[in-house]
Amino acid sequence: MSKIYTVLLADDDPDYLFQVAFFLRKAGYEVVAVESQAEAEQVIAKMKPDIAVFDLMMESDDSGFILCYKLKRRYPEVPVILATAVSRETGITFGLNSGQDRDWIRADLYLEKGVRPEQLELEIKKLLKI
């Protein structure tokens, strides 16, 4: 990877945030890691990341959706991955299987938390086309 890609990572779980940020930095990415929707919105106002990975539910149940909407409104070309443990915690299946769902939510990909960091990086590379 010759270009250094910037990943905006927003999650209110400090352990998950640390683990993913550590792995992505080790893989050569610049990572801007924040713990809240408000912090992520401040980052979006100041810079354009190459890709974003948002927790679906942070301080509110729809934080990830709101961040996705705001990022895509400002930078429509920036891919967004929503990562969540909703299915594991509630048993409710959530996904972005149809184009209609992805268009409404504006996320490019949905991943269940617990995905291996290597798999997350593979998905990031696919979305960045590297």
List each model region and its residues.
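Short amphipathic alpha-helix used as the core "switch/output" element in two-component signaling
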Residues: 42, 65-76, 97-98
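Conserved sequence signature across two-component system core domains
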Residues: 10-11, 34, 52
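Non-catalytic signal-transmission and effector/linker regions of two-component phosphorelay proteins
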Residues: 1-6, 112, 116-130
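Helix N-cap/capping motif at the beta->alpha junctions
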Residues: 33-42, 64
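Acidic di-acidic motifs
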Residues: 11-12, 113
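Alpha4 helix (beta4-alpha4-beta5 surface) of REC/receiver domains from two-component response regulators
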Residues: 66, 86-112, 118-122
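Two-component/phosphorelay signaling modules centered on CheY-like receiver
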Residues: 14-32
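Active-site beta3 strand of CheY-like receiver
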Residues: 47-54, 58
